UniProtKB/Swiss-Prot annotation:
One of its GO terms (cellular component) is virus tail. The record marks 1127-1128 as: Cleavage. GO terms for biological process: defense response to bacterium; killing of cells of another organism; symbiont entry into host; symbiont entry into host cell via disruption of host cell envelope; symbiont entry into host cell via disruption of host cell wall peptidoglycan; symbiont genome ejection through host cell envelope, long flexible tail mechanism; symbiont genome entry into host cell via pore formation in plasma membrane; viral tail assembly. InterPro entries: TMP_PB2_C, TMP_PB2_N. Homotrimer. This is Tape measure protein pb2 precursor. One of its GO terms (molecular function) is lyase activity. The gene is D18-19. Probably forms a coiled-coil structure. Keywords: Antimicrobial, Bacteriolytic enzyme, Coiled coil, Degradation of host cell envelope components during virus entry, Degradation of host peptidoglycans during virus entry, Late protein, Lyase, Pore-mediated penetration of viral genome into host cell, Viral genome ejection through host cell envelope, Viral long flexible tail ejection system, Viral penetration into host cytoplasm, Viral release from host cell, Viral tail assembly, Virion, Virus entry into host cell. It comes from Escherichia phage T5 (Enterobacteria phage T5).
Length: 1219
């Protein structure tokens, strides 16, 4: 049809002169021819497929024949041989399938490429034809009617070509169009389609096998978290159905049940319910089990109605509530109070009970039919095969053997291996999983060992029966032969022997399988035990350990041992905790709703009490932290103590709120008791109110404790507010009675107080006046309260208020007057005190006056006039004190400057840059004068002073302040002093060497003695010059250090004292007598000196010192008995430790590195002169005696300093002399 349309269109177009369009149509025809060629190639490839498919068919036939040859009567050997044959055929089948797959892949690739090329060519040609026709139509649209016919034909061609493109995309219609010329092509296509379907089914089977593998992995992961692998649940479910469902379906159902929280025991009950329904109603076992699990978990009664189990939810809930209330926990449950988990359990219990009630009589007869077991086993084998093929890990034969003959033992091994895998990956902190895994492994092993004993016993019985039968045959063999020869009898005994032999062989095979399974189960126990031992605290609580044999070698893991009873007990405790954890949301909800009713409060208290006990028990037996367990419950508590406090609060709340009848009875009894004693109704009511208030206060305390658990609970807030309102109402009843009595006796009580005030003789007039006014104010306030309760007392209330205001004003004026008198008396008391203490110092007088004024200001707060008065006095006194301070500073600066002969201009009154500039001028003038005075003493000192000046000038340029400059200059000068000392030591050492050489050469002649004397004199001069230089430098350093020791100008006296001490030392060093005596070089060297004995007399008229005892003992030191200063014996010095040093005073040295101090008397070993004794250079500064001499020569300066100090304290030397 397509070819015909194309030819007609081509002729029509050529007749009408559309050349380009005709060419496009020819291209379309060429493309279709190419498509036909591609189809022929496809046919050729498909033609090769029947031979391969025929080979597959023959292999399948041979496999089927091998399967038909399997006969149970031939025993296990025949079965094994048949299985071997199946394995060979399956190997060949696998090879043929691979070849088919390769050829199909090649063929389909060619077909795909050809069809794709054909479609592309047709589509391209069609688009080109359509474009050309559109162009032709636009060009010839307005010429003639013939062209209109061309347009119509072009439209039909376009539709025909569209149909051609659609046909090219559909392979079925293309092949159908070619059927007339294809020959065997349709048959080949059918064969190809069927094989493609087979392959697709095979791929789907492999996909299902992979899904099963993932399902088993999921089961292992779930076992890691819950302690019970899904494989174990599936095995329990399969056993409950007597093998009526496959292991695959059991795995699926077990996974679903595990997600809903059902355990293995419940799954067994569900399996029994499904089995009953399947047997009675004739439904499929898998569908029945699926309905039971989903119906119970989702509480969908429609699913179970179809299984003959009809239940009303309300009935199930009511029956479960009755069971809960029968446990005598003190909690009254209702249907509305049941949690989601409890409702699920209620429905599950009712389903099991209803199934047992209706179909329980069939339990003994229930057994899976052979066809059901065969279907389940075949399905399990198929699924196992699919799993094995999906993994590509094991040979095909081993995989088939494993899954075609899968027994209970092999399933147990799978379950045990899954448990071992779960145990190895279970975290040590997951106590639940560790315990459940260990308990499950132990129970599986014990159960299996018990079954194995029964199997062994049965095998022994079979063997004994077979031995007896053989013995019997041996005894009756002659008779049997005779009967057989005569045609009487048969071989029934032989058949029985064969049957028993096969059965015994099967039992032995099963025992062998069980031996393997037992090994795996024991390994599971070992693995779960090792996992449990990873949690040291849990293992310690359980007493679990590894037991090693006496002949154990290094690396032996030992055998896991634990008391099964302990393990089971811990498991139960952990299960209880896990159950509470699952229902923690319900417990939290009960706690939140505790304030809504006393029933909810009781339930919350009971739940929380159970939780506390469970946490304590779990923490005790597992070693887990109680606080961590509490946090895991997610009840809003962070520690066990907090939970206990909440439980105590709930318990007290229940106790306080659940005795309303008892409280009412107690109030009534108290009221009756007091009335019988006093016959006073008011007292009886008051006593009853006291009891009621106590009860209400207890309830309020309990309600607040409950509110502390749930601070934002609206019900608890309402409860607290309600009780507080009741307390206030109860108190208000007492207030009404008290007011009546007070109103009656008010006037009399006021009179009594006035009389008592008049009789008080201890108060002054001012105090009495204030007390009287305060009493009047109090009485007026009471009158106001009294009048306000009267219907016609409003006018009296206003009068009383005005009287209160007037009295308050009078009280304020009286208090102000009394305060003013008291405050003014303070200044009078100060003047008296100063006169008594003979205070004459102006500074002290002003300071004390300022302190009293501040006290007066503090006491006068609230009185504006007095505050202004005392603030003004404080300001004046402070100004006078500051002026006195400035004047005295100026006087001190002038006096100090004149005493030391300094050029100094006072800076009093100057501030800011003016004062800084004046201070700089004073410093420079003092420095110039000091340098000029030092230059008068020695020319070398002048040079040193000039060097110091240059160094100072350089340091000033880089320092940040005058004190920093002074410190840097002092450091530089100390460096110069060290250099001078080193140079002097070198010169003295050279002269000592010259003296030693001269003594060695001659030393006896006059010329030699004269030369030695000259050398000694030269050495003495060098030492004297060096000493003077050192004194000058050290004095300058001391002055600079004194300048930085305390703030200026208080450092001036220290600087002056340092300068004077240096001057005295320089004067002493300038004289020859001031140096240590050196023996004449011409005389014999004196080896020792006799200095006399140490006196034992102590002048008791002088002040005692700590050195007197050391002096009398003969310790080393300096001074006499009254001024003795002990000295150290030398020793090691360590970083960070301070040591006392010095000859004439205490110096503290803190070395930063390890040092050693050597006494002076030990220096002779290392530095001896020619005379054999050390040269000691004594430089005397201002000691006690020198200071006394200095004080005697400069008494005027000291007198002025003392006079100034006394003037600051308000006295004079003259006044002291008069006193």
């Amino acid at each position: 049809m397509t070819d015909k349309l194309i030819r007609e269109l081509l002729i029509d177009v050529k007749q009408k002169g559309a050349t380009r369009t005709a060419k496009s149509i020819e291209n379309v025809s060429d493309a279709l021819e190419n498509a036909a060629a591609a189809s022929e190639l496809t046919n050729e490839q498909l033609g090769k497929m029947p031979r391969t498919l025929y080979s597959i068919e023959r292999a399948a036939d041979r496999a089927a024949k091998s399967l038909t040859k399997m006969q149970a009567s031939r025993g296990m050997a025949g079965i094994t041989k048949s299985i071997d044959g199946i394995g060979d055929k399956l190997d060949y089948l696998a090879i043929q399938l691979i070849e088919v797959t390769d050829k199909l892949e090649i063929g389909f690739d060619g077909v795909s490429r050809s069809v794709k090329a054909m479609g592309n060519d047709v589509a391209a040609a069609t688009e080109k034809v359509q474009d050309r026709l559109y162009d032709t139509n636009r060009a010839l649209g307005g010429t003639s009617k013939g062209f209109n016919d061309t347009a119509g034909a072009a439209g039909r061609a376009s539709r025909a070509l569209g149909n051609t493109s659609g046909s090219a995309r559909g392979a079925t219609r293309d092949f159908a169009a070619m059927a007339k010329i294809g020959g065997r092509l349709p048959i080949m296509y059918a064969a190809l389609a069927s094989n493609v379907f087979v392959l697709q089914t095979a791929f789907e089977s492999l996909k299902v096998g992979d899904q099963l593998n993932r399902l088993e992995q999921f089961g292992t992961i779930v076992g890691t978290m819950t302690g019970t692998p899904v494989q174990t649940l599936a095995l329990s479910l399969q056993n409950a159905t007597n093998g009526a469902i496959s292991f695959e379906e059991a795995m699926r159902q077990a996974s679903s049940a595990s997600a809903y929280g059902f355990d293995s025991e419940q799954l067994e009950q569900f399996g029994l319910v499904a089995r009953r329904a399947a047997a009675v109603l004739g439904v499929d076992m898998t569908d029945a089990l699926n309905r039971v699990i989903k119906g119970v978990s989702k509480q969908e009664i429609e699913l179970l109605d179809e299984l003959g189990v009809t239940i009303r939810l309300n009935d199930a809930y009511e029956n479960y509530v009755k069971q809960l209330n029968a446990t005598s926990t003190g909690i009254k449950y209702t249907v509305d109070s049941l949690t989601t988990y409890q409702k699920q359990q209620a429905y599950a219990n009712e389903v099991i009970a209803e199934s047992t009630r209706r179909f329980g009589y069939l339990d003994d007869a229930l057994k899976a039919t052979s066809w059901e077991q065969f279907a389940a086993n075949a399905n399990s084998a198929l699924r196992s095969l699919q799993q094995s093929a999906a993994t590509y890990l094991n040979p095909v034969m081993d995989t088939l053997n494993t899954f075609l003959y899968q027994t209970k033992s092999s399933q147990m091994r799978v379950s045990a291996m899954a448990r071992s895998a779960s145990a190895k990956t279970t975290p040590a902190e997951n106590v639940t999983a560790l315990i459940e895994n260990a308990v499950g492994a132990r129970e599986d092993l014990d159960t299996y060992l018990k079954e194995s004993e029964e199997r062994v016993k049965k095998a022994q019985e079979l063997k004994q029966q077979l031995d007896d039968l053989k013995a019997k045959q041996a005894a009756t063999a002659p008779i049997a032969n005779a009967l057989t020869a005569g045609g009487i009898g048969g071989d029934e005994s032989n058949k029985l022997v064969v049957q028993l032999t096969n059965e015994l062989a099967r039992q032995n095979k099963e025992i062998e399988e069980r031996t393997k399974t037992e090994k795996v189960l024991r390994q599971a126990v070992q693995d779960t035990g090792e996992a449990l031992l990873r949690n040291g605290k849990l293992a310690e609580q359980l007493g679990a350990k590894m037991k090693y044999a006496d002949t154990a070698v290094p690396g032996d893991k030992g055998v896991f041992e634990v008391d099964p009873n302990n393990l089971k007990a811990v498991s139960e405790i952990q299960k209880n905790f896990d159950f509470l954890k699952k229902s923690s949301s319900d417990t939290a909800n009960n706690i939140r709703m505790a304030a809504s009713s006393i029933t909810n409060a009781k339930k919350a208290s009971s739940d929380l009490n159970s939780v506390v006990k469970a946490v304590e028990d779990t923490s005790k037996v597992t070693g887990q932290s109680a606080d961590t367990l509490v946090k895991n419950l997610n009840l809003g508590f962070s520690s066990l103590d907090q939970m206990k406090a909440a439980q105590k609060g709930l318990s007290e709340y229940v106790t306080a709120m659940d005795k309303s009848e008892q409280n009412a009875l107690e109030v009534a009894k108290r009221k009756d008791e007091v009335y019988n004693q006093t016959k006073d109704k008011a007292k009886a009511e008051a006593a009853a109110r006291e009891v009621l208030l106590r009860q209400q206060q207890e309830q309020l305390t309990a309600a607040k404790a409950l509110l502390a658990i749930n601070p934002n609970d609206p019900e608890a807030l309402k409860q607290v507010a309600k009780i507080e309102t009741e307390i206030l109402n109860t108190k208000a009843q007492g207030f009404e009675n008290a007011k009546k009595t007070k109103d009656y006796t008010d006037k009399i009580l006021g009179v009594d107080r006035e009389i008592a005030l008049l009789n008080d003789r201890t108060m002054t007039s001012t105090q009495y006046r204030l007390a009287q006014l305060r009493l009047e104010l109090q009485l007026e306030q009471e009158k106001t309260e009294l009048y306000s309760k009267q219907a016609d007392g409003q006018a009296k209330v206003e009068q009383s208020r005005r009287a209160q205001a007037q009295i308050s004003r009078e009280i304020w004026e009286a208090e102000k007057q009394g305060t003013a008198s008291h405050v003014s008396a303070l200044m009078d008391a100060l003047e008296v005190s100063q006169t008594q203490r003979n205070v004459t110092g102006q500074s002290q007088i002003l300071t004390e006056r300022l302190s009293i004024l501040q006290q007066q200001l503090e006491l006068s707060k609230g009185n504006t006039e007095e505050e202004l008065k005392y603030r003004n006095e404080i300001y004046k006194t402070s100004a006078a004190l500051e002026q006195l301070k400035k004047q005295r500073e100026s006087q001190m600066q002038q006096q100090v400057g004149s005493s030391v002969g300094a050029t100094y201009t006072p800076t009093t009154g100057l501030i800011g840059e003016d004062k800084d500039f004046a201070d700089m001028q004073n410093r420079m003038a003092s420095y110039d004068q000091a340098i000029s005075k030092l230059s008068e003493l020695n020319s070398e000192a002048t040079a040193v002073a000039q060097s110091m000046g240059n160094l100072t000038n350089a340091m000033i340029q880089f320092s940040q302040g005058s004190l920093d400059t002074t410190s840097m200059i002092a450091s530089g000068m100390q460096t110069v002093a060290s250099m001078i000392q080193y140079s002097t030591s070198q010169q003295v050492s050279a002269i000592d060497q010259a003296i030693a050489a001269e003594q060695k050469r001659d030393g006896k002649s006059e010329a030699s003695k004269a030369k030695l004397k000259k050398l000694e004199a030269e050495k003495l001069k060098i030492q004297q010059d060096a000493a003077k230089k050192q004194i000058i430098i050290q004095t300058a350093v001391a002055v600079m250090q004194a300048a930085t020791a305390v703030p200026y100008p208080f450092s001036i006296p220290l600087m002056v004292a340092a300068g004077l001490a240096g001057a005295l030392a320089l004067a002493q060093a300038s004289s020859a007598s001031g140096m240590s005596s050196i023996a004449d070089s011409g005389a014999d060297t004196t080896q020792y000196l006799t200095l006399g004995e140490r006196q034992k007399n102590v002048d008791v008229s002088m002040q005692a010192s700590s050195g007197e005892l050391s002096y009398l003992r003969g310790d080393k030191g300096i001074g006499n008995a009254n001024s003795f200063v002990p000295r150290a014996e030398g020793g090691m010095m360590y970083p960070g430790v301070s040591y006392q040093m010095g000859e004439h005073g205490t110096e503290v040295v803190t070395p930063m590195v390890p040092m050693k101090a050597t006494p002076n008397d030990q220096l002779s070993d290392g530095s001896k002169t020619t005379s054999g004794r050390p040269i000691i250079l004594n430089i005397s500064t201002m000691d006690a005696a020198s200071f006394r001499d200095f004080a005697s020569n400069n008494s005027t300066a000291f007198r002025d300093a003392v006079e100034l100090a006394l003037n600051e304290n308000g006295t004079t030397l003259k006044s002291l002399g008069n006193s």
